[in-house]
Amino acid sequence: MRLVQLSRHSIAFPSPEGALREPNGLLALGGDLSPARLLMAYQRGIFPWFSPGDPILWWSPDPRAVLWPESLHISRSMKRFHKRSPYRVTMNYAFGQVIEGCASDREEGTWITRGVVEAYHRLHELGHAHSIEVWREDELVGGMYGVAQGTLFCGESMFSRMENASKTALLVFCEEFIGHGGKLIDCQVLNDHTASLGACEIPRRNYLNYLNQMRLGRLPNNFWVPRCLFSPQE
C-alpha cells in the first residue's frame, strides 16, 4: 500500500481497498476540488479532508461510520425539547450560510477552507450538495450539509449556536429522508457525538456495497426543492 499522487489531468481515483491502514483510510493526495472530481470521489466512497496549508488529502477509512436514519437515538430530554421546539427547520434555503457556519464553528481550526467552501457551493449550485437550516425567528442558529448519492446522504458537517440546534437539524432531516425513501447517512469517521446519536461502524467493503446500490436509487424529484420541513407550534 502506498499513497497515490493524483493528476490534475485525470479525475480517476485508485481503489479504496488500497488505502493506508495508518493513518486509517488515507488513499491519495493532490488533484483539485472540481465538481467532477468531487462527484467521482463520492461515487467511489472517498472524501477530502485536510488542514489549511496542506495538500488535498483523500480518505476512505475502514471501518466506515454510518447512521441508519431509523436508528437515530433521540434522548428523552431531546424528545421533550423537540415537542416544544422554538425552531423552524428548512432545506436548501441558505446553503452558503450553513457551510460558513460549519467553517467558523470549530475553535480548534477547521478543514473547511475558503477553497472547500467554494467547491461545495459549486456542488450545491449543480444540485448535488444540500443544506438543512435551523432558525430561531430569522436567525440561523444551526444546520448541516452534505452530498446526495441517490438514497444515500453523505453528511459532511454540522454546527450549533443554540441548544439542540444541530440535533434538531438531524432529527427533522432523518424523518423527512426516511419518509421519502432515504436509506443511509454516511458519517465518515465515528466520534463520540455521532455515536451518541446512533451512528455505528461497518466494514468499508459493506459501505461500498451499500453505496453502489443506493447511489442508483432515486428520491422523489422534488425532494431537494427548497422548503420548510418543520415549524414551531403556535
Swiss-Prot record:
A single GO molecular function, which one?
leucyl-tRNA--protein transferase activity
Signal peptide boundaries:
none
What are the coiled-coil residue ranges? none
One GO cellular component term, please give it: cytoplasm
- Its EC number is 2.3.2.6
Which reactions are catalysed by this chain?
N-terminal L-lysyl-[protein] + L-leucyl-tRNA(Leu) = N-terminal L-leucyl-L-lysyl-[protein] + tRNA(Leu) + H(+); N-terminal L-arginyl-[protein] + L-leucyl-tRNA(Leu) = N-terminal L-leucyl-L-arginyl-[protein] + tRNA(Leu) + H(+); L-phenylalanyl-tRNA(Phe) + an N-terminal L-alpha-aminoacyl-[protein] = an N-terminal L-phenylalanyl-L-alpha-aminoacyl-[protein] + tRNA(Phe)
What subcellular compartments does it reside in? Answer: Cytoplasm
Give a Pfam family name.
Leu_Phe_trans
> Which InterPro entries does the record cross-reference, listed alphabetically?
Acyl_CoA_acyltransferase (IPR016181), Leu/Phe-tRNA_Trfase (IPR004616), Leu/Phe-tRNA_Trfase_C (IPR042203), Leu/Phe-tRNA_Trfase_N (IPR042221)
Q: Name one GO biological process term.
A: protein catabolic process
Q: Which UniProt keywords apply?
A: Acyltransferase, Cytoplasm, Transferase
Q: What is this protein's function?
A: Functions in the N-end rule pathway of protein degradation where it conjugates Leu, Phe and, less efficiently, Met from aminoacyl-tRNAs to the N-termini of proteins containing an N-terminal arginine or lysine.
Q: Which NCBIfam families match?
A: aat
Q: Which HAMAP family match?
A: Leu_Phe_trans (MF_00688)
Q: Which family does it belong to?
A: Belongs to the L/F-transferase family.
What is the protein named?
Leucyl/phenylalanyl-tRNA--protein transferase
Recorded name of the encoding gene: aat
